[in-house]
């Protein structure tokens, strides 16, 4: 793809390159953001990093990136750190398959206690009392929700824009939109804000 003068090289994660970590602990936030999900999970399970380390790295990255691309307009820091504190990721612990990995959830899917707008002003201030079963299952397996990713209104759109949060920008070219309806999820992954980001597909969003 030809280079663009509007490409955010400073924030893109080079997905074509190996992200395997070299060296010894402790690992820094910037290093963690360049790892793949399975590599971070392995480090968590070996006790070389903690869920709190991952959250620190993720939120630092989110704070750096979000003013430019608007991929994850809602975060839930207190909830995330509380979840991390409750996990036991020791060798004999029961943190689950994800072992404390930070994840993002598309803003069409309710997360208990976290603003969920569905991308529409009709639900601009909606805070659900219960999580969607998908979220509950991910959390039961050690996933830690850090925020909600942007989506078109009610997921019905080919571009990631809504009247609540505005447009998400494509980190490869900020004159473009990453598309819908999981554009916020895609942009959050491309920029290394999180290692796993939930998306949904009714008419081609993930295809």
Task: Map each language-model feature to its residues.
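Short alpha-helical functional segments enriched in proximate histidine and acidic residues
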Residues: 61, 65, 83, 87, ...
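Enzymes and membrane/adaptor proteins characterized by extended Gly/Ser/Thr/Asp/Glu-rich
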Residues: 97-134
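Long amphipathic alpha-helix in the N-terminal Rossmann-like dinucleotide-binding domain
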Residues: 78-85, 142-143, 152
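Conserved hydrophobic/aromatic pocket- or pore-lining residues that grip, position, or stack substrates
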Residues: 58, 80, 106, 138, ...
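An N-terminal boundary/leader segment
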Residues: 1-76, 81
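Glycine-rich, aromatic-flanked loop segments that form ligand/cofactor-binding clefts
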Residues: 90-109, 143, 148-150
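Hydrophobic face of alpha-helices
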Residues: 52-56, 102, 135, 139
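Short glycine/serine-rich loop segments
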Residues: 130-207
